[in-house]
């Protein structure tokens, strides 16, 4: 099912919009709070969740006068810093506490910025509870798309990834049957134009130097391998109910075109703007309306010529692996995602090389049995088995 089964935007919304920000201390979470900071009359941060940062949570809870704070790491309980939470703010602990925020009666919209597979549970809980889900947790769709998407009602799920937000905006008012191709753009990462021989020698510090976007470490490495773009292909496949062979990747070094949709009549709609994650976050919170810009607008007369190149799936094999996983479907995307998280982490810790990431993921995929997706418990088991297998390939 596509999120564009019905293109009519939701007409009724609570104002101020009552928001729960999950993964609030991460890159997307902090930028979400910054958007909320600029629109205090339109957005109320009711709840926030972090992994373990008591200092950050206390500061944010006081700034936004939050009623609820959750810590995924239960060991934070008893931290003396929590004494400084607002008097009427309730703190809770453990993974279940994060999920509980997604179903609060006082919450209209859940911003799911939790990194990794853990965000699936909160995303499913939010959708089942009828909340609007502004999601930046691509793993929710890549791993659990077969479970999540049949539950999503039109207008309920708004993508926060810049590429999928762009596609979403291009498709408003359009008939999904008229889509010829969807083009997801990417900067090419820090190693655009490198050969396989050159990639043998790059370090984690090299890979973390993204040319355009300010993001967390895990996703920045994924951008360097182009696995991030591969995950986004699978996302688009689920979100817009589009076959994998109608999804293309365009390397666009200027990062001004965030994605494009080509229609059967040959026309193309593109969404352009500044390279600022606050733009898609703001759109997700304001939809179906638009709020005044807080990001610096693009000075088009000063912009370099806009260029595009096909992505090199032979040099950057993770992109080809993701396309294969999305085409096969079933539990293979879950297996791929789990192996990638293990390999990504190992690379950042100096335990494997850059090209080893691709090899670890490929070996794990090849050694795993692909099943039809049945339920979340099955995916949890598949994820755990794939991680254990991937760790064995790290050595």
Stretches found by the model and what they are:
Residues 1-395:
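Catalytic, metal-anchored helix/loop core of enzyme active sites in primary metabolism
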